[in-house]
Structure formats: structure tokens, C-alpha cells
């Protein structure tokens, strides 16, 4: 049966379109390269122990004074706030393209604290009939409407064709079909969103990739209830070798938003509409499209939706969060208990090893020997020929060991090397205890 050359038209009959172009080829899978492009897990960097004066980088951070903690907190909080702000601006409130079908009603609900203006730009056919409404509160979804489209098709082999419909929750779609090619069949699907359509195009024979999937022949109809507001694609596909002729009648019972109380409406006189969002006010916008038009096989409408951020809100939020964390950090540092090691007098840079017995060389030597005994853990036992090196600095092997660490008391380095260890690592190389102070030993 051939396609009719002319189609009857009347005011009561739905728009009828003869489809001769606009078909797409299916994407055959199996040509992937086989590479897995997922990110590799991050490398784990092992920590190095202290060896002969080398310092672990992570230990340098531990030695920072408590006076630097608030500034570190400021840097961390500022970085976190900037990351969250960029995520909101580029992600949740980033620029997106909205595809609508006939009689669409798309709700836009910006957050008034972070959004100052809603900008909608018409793409594609200029003057297509899109209208942007502004309301003081979210409108009711209670306006019922019906429309239908009839399409005559001659689907080539290994091709498909689709029609977009933006449907709100509570709508209903009925698709009637009549396959005129005897002994032939087509795939008829209803896919949710671009992702659902793309999955079906990659493998048309899989029934679990779309909301509705049928193999049609002869005549009949399918129905589908809509439970989520989104864009939906009604598509037919031919994976066989011969061309298939068919008639597709799409009937929609839609639910639209009520825009009778709108205080703002814009019909895109300059291909762009800007809706100002009041601060701390309930606001909503609705983008609508006209009904189906005759001799328009697609009835598609495209608009670019973007948001102008309210920068002052981001700055104030960052300041408040930073101030709160600084206060919490300050209170936490003040309430930390003072340990016994921190009570050591650190203002006395030079002090005798044994108070009251500075003139007693034998007592000083006895105490000095007892300190040096503990260094065998680091140096190990040496022969008599190496006894002279046991009293040299274990770091530079040049100067004598003339200092010890508080609070552990180990003596393994000269005063210069010991000071450098305290300033860089901050931990005793023998027992790994934190160095509170480096005391110099004077031979009197």
C-alpha cells in the first residue's frame, strides 16, 4: 500500500505529517576498542623513617606551632567553600539545554538565596511560540489537555525515527499503529530521557532499556502512564533488510501547570528572557511550548537555561562558616590539657645537667655517662678501636655530643644537629618521642 499523495485536513482532525526524511542509522555495538578508561586507583605513598638526619615530610607538619592552626583552618575552609560554590554554580545551577515537545509545561524552581536571575534563551527556530512565565509561588499541576499527531512513515532498513514529548506526572500516552507492509514488523518504544533513547539505539533488541518496548505488526495500540515529569521519546525502528511502511498516531492526555496567576510573561522578543528572582522569596518559572503544528514532523523546541548566581550570598556564607570554625578551633585549643612535659621551663636556654653540683666533675661525668649509655640503641656495640667515635655526633660525626633532648634525655648529637632535628622533625631519633627542648651541655 503506497503513501497518500495528499492528506485531508480539517479543524477537528489532528495534524498529519508525511515522513520521508529525518531517519537515523542505528549504532552497531561491538566496535569498542576494549580499553577500560576508568581511573586507576591512586598510588599509596609510603612513609620513610628518620635515618641519619633525613626528615619525613609528614612530620614537619606536626611540628607547626598552635599559632598557625587558625590560619590552616582558614585555608581549608576557604578551599572547601570555593569547591562547594563551584559545584553549585557549574553543577546544580549550571547551563543546560531543555528539549520540549508540543504543549509542554516545564517547571523551573531556583533557590532565591543563591540565584539572582533566571535566563532562558531560545535556540533553533526563532519565534517558535515559547513563553516564559514568572510566578510568586509554585503553580498547581491541574490543567488537563489533549492533543495528537499522525505520522506516515516509510522506515528504511537499519534506521529509526523518534518524536519528543515533555510530559508531567499524571499524563498518559496512547500510540496507535498500522504496519502496512505485509509480513514486516517494527520496534515501537517509549524511552525516558536522552539516556534511555541512547541505550535503545545501541541495542534495539533489548527490552529492558526503555520504559515501553514492543515489536509491532499489522495494527494495534499501546498505552503508557507517566509517573515522573521528564522528556519522553516515542520511537520506531527497523532492523530488517527491507523498507517498512507504517502509520503512527500519538495521542497524549497531558497535565500542565496553571499559569493564570503569573506576574511575568515573556515571548522571547530578542530570543532571550531574563526573570529576576527576589531574595528570600518564593519564586517559580514555567516554560511552555505551543501545540503541534501541521507539516512539522518533529514539533521540537530547544531552549538554553542558565542561572546568574547571587555572589553576595556565596561570600557571606563563606565568611560565616570560616568564622564559626575559627571560634571552634580556638575553644578547642584553649581546653587542651597541659601535660607534664609542657611544664618544663623552656626559657632557660643554658642550664646545668645536675643543679647544685656544677663543680663536681665526677658527678657530672657520672650523669653524662648514664645518658650516653642509652645511645647504644642507635649506634650498637663497637670495638675498642672505635671507642673514640662513640662520643661524636651521630649525625655529622664531626662535633662532640654536647646536647640532650627534653623530655626523653637522649644524647646522640651535637647542639647544632640537635637543634636542626628539633626544628625539622621534632622527634627523638632514638625513642621517637616529641622533642620539647634541646639543652646544651657545658664542660665545667
Curated annotation (Swiss-Prot):
Question: What is its subcellular localisation?
Answer: Endomembrane system
- Does the record carry DNA-binding as a key word? no
The alphabetical list of record keywords is:
Membrane, Metal-binding, Transferase, Transmembrane, Transmembrane helix, Ubl conjugation pathway, Zinc, Zinc-finger
Span of zinc fingers (RING-type): 393-432
A Gene Ontology BP annotation from the UniProt entry = protein ubiquitination
Q: How does it sit in the membrane?
A: Multi-pass membrane protein
Q: Primary place of residence?
A: membrane
Mind telling me what this protein is named?
A: E3 ubiquitin-protein ligase APD2
Which species is this UniProt entry from?
Arabidopsis thaliana
Primary gene name: APD2
Amino acid at each position: 500500500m503506497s503513501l497518500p499523495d495528499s492528506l485531508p485536513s480539517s479543524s477537528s482532525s489532528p495534524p498529519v505529517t508525511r515522513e520521508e526524511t529525518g531517519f537515523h542509522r542505528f549504532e552497531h555495538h561491538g566496535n569498542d576498542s576494549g580499553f577500560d578508561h576508568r581511573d586507576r586507583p591512586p598510588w599509596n605513598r609510603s612513609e620513610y623513617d628518620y635515618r641519619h638526619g633525613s626528615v619525613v615530610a609528614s612530620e614537619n607538619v606536626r611540628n607547626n606551632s598552635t599559632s598557625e592552626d587558625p590560619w590552616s583552618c582558614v585555608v581549608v575552609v576557604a578551599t572547601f567553600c570555593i569547591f562547594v560554590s563551584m559545584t553549585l554554580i557549574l553543577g546544580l545551577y549550571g547551563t543546560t539545554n531543555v528539549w520540549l515537545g508540543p504543549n509542554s509545561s516545564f517547571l523551573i524552581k531556583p533557590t532565591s538565596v543563591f540565584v539572582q536571575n533566571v535566563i532562558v534563551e531560545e535556540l533553533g527556530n526563532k519565534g517558535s511560540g515559547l513563553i516564559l512565565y514568572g510566578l510568586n509561588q509554585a503553580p498547581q499541576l491541574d490543567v488537563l489537555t489533549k492533543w495528537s499527531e499522525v505520522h506516515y512513515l516509510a522506515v528504511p532498513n537499519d534506521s529509526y525515527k523518534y518524536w519528543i514529548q515533555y510530559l508531567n506526572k499524571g499524563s498518559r500516552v496512547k500510540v496507535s499503529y498500522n504496519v502496512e507492509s505485509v509480513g514486516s514488523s517494527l520496534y515501537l518504544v517509549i524511552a525516558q530521557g536522552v539516556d534511555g533513547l541512547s541505550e535503545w539505539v545501541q541495542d534495539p533488541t533489548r527490552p529492558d532499556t526503555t520504559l515501553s518496548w514492543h515489536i509491532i505488526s499489522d495494527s494495534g495500540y499501546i498505552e503508557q502512564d507517566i509517573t515522573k515529569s521528564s522528556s519522553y521519546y516515542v520511537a520506531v525502528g527497523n532492523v530488517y533488510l527491507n523498507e517498512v511502511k507504517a502509520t503512527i498516531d500519538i495521542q497524549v492526555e497531558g497535565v500542565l501547570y496553571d499559569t493564570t496567576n503569573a506576574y511575568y510573561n515573556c515571548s522571547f522578543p530578542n530570543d532571550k528572557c531574563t526573570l529576576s528572582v527576589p531574595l528570600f522569596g518564593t519564586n517559580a518559572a514555567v516554560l511552555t511550548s505551543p501545540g503541534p503544528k501541521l507539516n512539522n514532523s518533529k514539533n521540537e523546541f530547544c531552549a538554553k537555561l542558565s542561572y546568574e548566581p547571587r555572589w553576595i550570598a556565596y561570600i557571606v556564607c563563606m565568611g560565616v562558616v570560616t568564622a564559626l570554625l575559627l571560634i571552634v578551633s580556638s575553644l578547642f585549643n584553649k581546653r587542651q590539657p597541659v601535660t607534664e612535659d609542657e611544664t618544663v621551663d623552656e626559657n632557660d636556654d643554658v642550664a646545668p645537667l645536675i643543679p647544685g653540683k656544677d663543680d663536681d666533675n665526677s658527678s657530672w661525668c657520672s650523669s653524662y655517662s648514664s645518658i650516653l649509655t642509652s645511645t647504644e640503641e642507635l649506634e650498637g656495640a663497637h670495638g675498642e678501636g672505635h671507642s673514640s667515635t662513640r662520643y661524636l655526633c651521630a649525625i655529622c660525626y664531626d662535633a662532640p655530643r654536647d646536647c640532650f633532648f627534653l623530655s626523653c634525655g637522649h644524647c646522640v648529637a651535637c647542639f647544632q644537629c640537635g637543634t636542626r632535628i628539633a626544628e625539622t622533625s621534632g622527634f627523638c631519633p632514638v625513642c621517637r618521642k616529641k622533642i620539647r627542648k634541646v639543652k646544651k651541655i657545658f664542660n665545667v
